[in-house]
Regions:
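N-terminal secretory signal peptides and thylakoid transit peptides that target proteins
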Residues: 2-20
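Core segments of cupin and vicinal oxygen chelate
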Residues: 5, 20, 48, 57-97, ...
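C-terminal segment of classical bacterial N-terminal signal peptides
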Residues: 22-24
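N-terminal beta-strand motif that seeds the catalytic metal site of vicinal oxygen chelate
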Residues: 29-64, 111-113, 169-215, 243, ...
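Residues that flank catalytic or metal-binding motifs in active/ligand-binding sites
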Residues: 52, 84, 93, 109-111, ...
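Vicinal oxygen chelate
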Residues: 61-64, 113-162, 208-213, 263-332, ...
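Mid-chain, structured segments of secreted extracytoplasmic proteins
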Residues: 84-120, 126-127, 252-253, 262-265
């Protein structure tokens, strides 16, 4: 979710008892017109049945530094290697984070994400994408799809209306070999135990040039239902039977002649069991990720902060704490409880 103003540790500690209090379901105050529009989009059944968030990819100038950082923090084993890309397992897998080199002179980025679908078959997926205006191209540009063969493994990537790259693979995909990319026989243990144990991938928040258009596009293509609302016109789109979701934000015109914010994957969220924001902040600090403090503007690399999502954005009465940190390249990550669904309650786990 888009970040808000930070809070101090003292305020965070004062809010911790709210974990047993905030149990309010979302949706009663949501605009019925918006709700109807989104439900109708998937009423005839999804042409492509999405079940999981499979992975997201980091493109960075120093992949080894990033691999060392994430293994040191989370103890992630190497699930597979593809050329110069290292695939780090999340939890029990097959979900993962891929870390590879950025193009020359390119800024570090979360350069794509992948959704796991049932009964993956390239021809069927291409036909479904074509029916929604996504046509074949040499690369995954806006409304274009490209399939590359990797030693017999098809990797299918397409660009949405903003050119955000989404990959579609089988739910069993591990970044490995075989027709479904689900053969990862040689798993390399992490050289470091890790300080926090990841459970799963929670969500991605994507800055779009037109959030309403993005929501409609993904609803029509995947038949995604509404998981929660983080504001009257800010739905989260449910991914399969899990608590995972996608969220699209943005689309407001730039103010005062400023340049509009380019579309991008703003941040990725990972989940862990027994989420305690104060303890997580302390653990991050032992790994060199220090509190951001009250400084204005974007957080630099290796910083952490907590924001409180209040009732007007679907949070708990006292606020739902949401914890962010930046990695060595300044890429923004979020950590939440494994039950987090983007809803209300102290843990953000109360959804409709």
């Amino acid at each position: 979710m888009p970040s808000m103003s930070g809070i101090t540790r003292r305020r965070l500690l004062a809010s911790l008892p709210a974990v047993a209090l905030a149990r309010r379901a979302l949706g009663a105050g949501s605009p019925e017109g918006l709700r109807h529009e989104f439900i109708q989009a998937g009423a005839s059944g999804p042409p492509i049945r999405v079940r999981t968030i499979s992975h997201f990819g980091l493109a960075v100038p120093d992949p080894k530094r990033s691999v060392d950082f994430y293994q040191g923090l989370f103890g992630m084993p190497v699930q597979a290697r593809v050329d110069t890309t290292t695939i780090l397992r999340v939890g029990a897998g097959p979900q993962f984070i891929s870390i590879g080199p950025a193009a020359a002179n390119a800024a570090p980025s979360i350069n794509h994400y992948c959704l796991g679908i049932e009964n993956f078959a390239v021809d069927r997926v291409l036909a479904a994408l074509a029916a929604h205006g996504v046509t074949k191209g040499d690369t995954a540009g806006p409304m274009k799809v490209a399939v590359t063969m990797r030693d017999g493994t098809p990797d299918l990537l397409f660009g949405d209306p903003d050119g955000i790259v989404c990959q579609l693979q089988d739910v069993s995909y591990c970044g490995g070999s075989g027709p479904l990319g689900n053969v990862c026989r040689t798993v390399e243990p992490s050289p470091k135990k890790g300080l926090l144990a990841l459970r799963d991938l929670s969500h991605l928040t994507i800055f779009s040039s037109d959030a309403e258009r993005s929501n409609t596009f993904y609803q029509d293509l995947f038949g995604l239902s509404i998981r929660s609302y983080q504001g009257p016109t800010a739905p989260t789109l449910a991914i399969g039977p899990t608590v995972a979701f996608l969220m699209f934000a943005g689309g407001a015109p730039a103010r005062g002649g400023a340049t509009a914010r380019p579309a991008s994957i703003n941040h990725a969220c990972m989940s862990l069991d027994g989420f305690n924001p104060e303890q997580v902040l302390k653990t991050l600090e032992t790994h060199g990720v220090t509190p951001r403090g009250d400084s204005a503007g974007p957080a630099g690399p290796m910083k952490s902060y907590v924001t409180m999502r209040m009732e007007n954005r679907g949070g708990a009465p006292g606020g739902t704490p949401e914890l962010y940190f930046t990695d060595p390249d300044g890429l923004l990550m979020q950590l939440q409880d494994s039950s987090y669904c983007g809803g209300s309650g102290f843990l953000g786990n109360v959804c409709k």
